[in-house]
Amino acid sequence: MVVNIYDTANELERQMRQTQEFIGLKEAFDDLKADKEATDLFVKFQAKQAAAQQKQMQGQEISEDEIKEIQALAKDVTSKDVIQALMAKEQQVDQMIQQLNQIITGPLQELYKQFGPQEG
């Protein structure tokens, strides 16, 4: 029997869009977009965080000023209820993805387990 795993993946993608977790995240993004101040703050925080991560990946140091700016932005971001709600929904989606990843990688884990530490 030939299995087209990509058809299964595409079906999973369609089903994911119908989950409560994804719908909740989409609604949280809609709520964020309705609050211009929170949206601007969120976008600025994401940009600063991405820039810092990029520097780290390139082996560059992040300055003390950059760290302080990111920390201040993080404090401002977490003070916004709409962003806190979004972050909670992101965590729910992330949990779902982690669980799916465990299921999907189950066959690989079984293969490698045979070479793991032996009890006895």
UniProtKB/Swiss-Prot annotation:
Q: Which Gene3D superfamilies match?
A: YheA/YmcA-like
UniProt-listed Pfam families: Com_YlbF
- Family note: Belongs to the UPF0342 family.
The name this protein carries in UniProt is UPF0342 protein LAF_1331
**Source organism per UniProt:** Limosilactobacillus fermentum (strain NBRC 3956 / LMG 18251)
